[in-house]
Amino acid sequence: MKWTILTALLIISAESKNLYKRDSEPHIRFLGEVYKKVDTIDFRGLVLITLAQHLQKCPFEELAKQVEQITTLAQACAAGARHADCATPLITLFLNRICAVPELSATYDWSTECCAKSDPERHQCFRAHRNPAPGTHYKRPEPEELCESYKKNKEDVLAHYIYEVSRGHPVLYSPAVLGFAYQFNGICSHCCEEEDKTTCFKDRMTQLKKALHIVEVQQKESCRILDNFGVRVLQALKLVKISKKNPKATFEVAQKLTSEVTHLNEDCCHGDMLECMIERMELTEHTCEHHEDISTKLKTCCEKPLIERTHCIVNLENDDIPEDLPKKVTKFVEDPEVCKLFADKKDIFLAEFLYEYGRRHPELSDQLLLRIAKGYEHQLEKCCELENFLECLKDGEHVLADAIKESTELTEKDCAIQQKLGDYLFQNVLLIRYTKKMPHVTTPSLIHITKHMTEVGDKCCALPNTQKMPCAEGGLSLIIGEFCEMEKTHPINEHVKNCCWKSYSNRRNCFTNLGPDDSYVAPEITDDTFHFTEDLCTLPEEELKNKKQGFIATLVKVKPHVTDELYGQIAVEFTKMREKCCAAEDHQACFNAEEPILIEHCKQLAA
């Protein structure tokens, strides 16, 4: 699709009064200005995040000293001090501080080259060298020790958490890190009062880690869309999300929010984390200033402190659809002027269609709504060439209904299969399906991908029907996005490449409809294809499941054209062999004797 509709959002911004003011030139930020926006504790946190994301190997104690010095300077700047650093652009100030760290080059050999440059080249150099450092994820102390420290000095415990998360996730947005620190604070406060602290921390921290992972993956996906499909596709996706979440907002408000959110993502994705941090706070402030024009659900979030507001707004549930909103917008299919509107202001007209359809259909996935807009544009191009264009457009409604029905039925079908089989067997079904599609992908990667797909199903199929499709296709899109990023450096086949890069909105559909790899030549089964060892008798349950799935994937790779039923028969034989040999006195001797028999059965499949 020609995503020219997205230019509309910028055109409209120029034609109407700004809801949010944005300078045409980049805004130069200063320390005192930022200090005034948040309270001192949050300011310290933001400074620590910025330093830890740039200096991932630097000890906490060293960064803590820098935080104190910068905070003291910020307080003076905010009070009107004439210190030279108060008039130094924020990113320049931070990089000056970083480059002044004693023996910096001993830890970061590339820092000498970076620090010799002038901004913005210096900043770009630092961004290029920012990578997650191994072993820098937060390691929680034992509950009793943690609670004792928390009781003595809560701020220090939270600062250590911020430090570890920041250096382990150097591209995670600063407000997001602070938001997770607030949640961690709540976990400590609650669990330290519980009798079974260990279980409490384990359960709550597992949930927090999952939430952090999801936010990070979502942020990376926005950046991947921006890099691979361009700003206009990202803008279309943001318009859909905003329209679904805020159905009471006018088109003007929705498109301006979209423009702001997209610009924020551009800054964040390009690595300008300070600007990203400030713009995120400003967007939150602006949203709350105009909350009555956006959503009735916002008021509660906007009563919270600035940093907490951001997390609240991002996770806010969809507003209720206005009761007086007509279910159908006749303008797009029955208005005699429809082709004139399309011809005169194509971009604006199509953007408005996306907005109107999105706000009426929160039960549809973002990607399906983008496909619908794509189909509508195609229908207009075809019908507006005809004399009876209105009849032609009405015929297009059947195509639209079929697309919605197909996606709905697919979600229902997969949920029914998963509910019937259970997670493990459902993953095995997916494993067979995707190994046939992509036999060149490594077995561990196939197991990893299908496990995450199963987790998406487990989460989304439990939701109400109105939420299943957005959850499922949204989750699968994130998995596919990560997979396609891997495909860039490890090409698989032309069909997969086409699914990854031809169309963002059609990615999931493309992978679902992808057939077996017709270019794949299966290797011969040899004595080295399968190996069964006595550790099959002692492995923990999860590792044993992985071993079984590794066997299934390898079997599909050597016999890609047999039926699922035959794969199932061999899997049953594998299980029987394991049970027999694990009951034998000499496990390995038994496996050595049974292995050739099972291999021979595998060779005979579809022979």
Swiss-Prot record:
Matching InterPro entries, A to Z?
Answer: ALB/AFP/VDB, Serum_albumin-like, Serum_albumin/AFP/Afamin, Serum_albumin_CS, Serum_albumin_N
Residues bound to Ca(2+) are 272, 275
Q: Which Gene3D superfamilies match?
A: 1.10.246.10
Keyword list (alphabetical) reads:
Calcium, Cleavage on pair of basic residues, Copper, Disulfide bond, Lipid-binding, Metal-binding, Protease inhibitor, Repeat, Secreted, Serine protease inhibitor, Signal, Zinc
Query: Which residues does UniProt assign to the signal peptide?
Result: 1-16
Q: Where does Zn(2+) bind?
A: 270, 272
Q: Which domain of life is it from?
A: Eukaryota
Q: Which GO terms describe its cellular component?
A: blood microparticle; cytoplasm
Which residue ranges make up the pro-region?
17-20
Localization of this protein: Secreted
Expressed in which tissues: Plasma. In the skin, widely distributed around the membranes of epithelial layer cells and within the stratum spongiosum of the dermis (at protein level).
Q: Which cysteines are joined by disulfide bonds?
A: 77-86, 99-115, 114-125, 147-192, 191-200, 223-269, 268-276, 288-302, 301-312, 339-384, 383-392, 415-461, 460-471, 484-500, 499-510, 537-582, 581-590
- Annotated PROSITE patterns: ALBUMIN_1 (PS00212), ALBUMIN_2 (PS51438)
Gene Ontology MF terms in the entry: lipid binding; metal ion binding; serine-type endopeptidase inhibitor activity
SUPFAM superfamilies for the chain? Serum albumin-like
The segment(s) forming the Albumin domain are 19-209, 210-401, 403-600
Q: Which residues bind Cu cation?
A: 27
Name the family the entry cites. Belongs to the ALB/AFP/VDB family.
Functional summary from the UniProt entry: Serum albumin, the main protein of plasma, has a good binding capacity for water, Ca(2+), Na(+), K(+), fatty acids, hormones, bilirubin and drugs. Its main function is the regulation of the colloidal osmotic pressure of blood. Potent inhibitor of trypsin but has no inhibitory effect on thrombin, chymotrypsin, elastase and subtilisin.
List, alphabetically, the PANTHER family matched.
Answer: AFAMIN, SERUM ALBUMIN-RELATED
This one is known as Serum albumin
Q: Which organism is it from?
A: Bombina maxima (Giant fire-bellied toad)
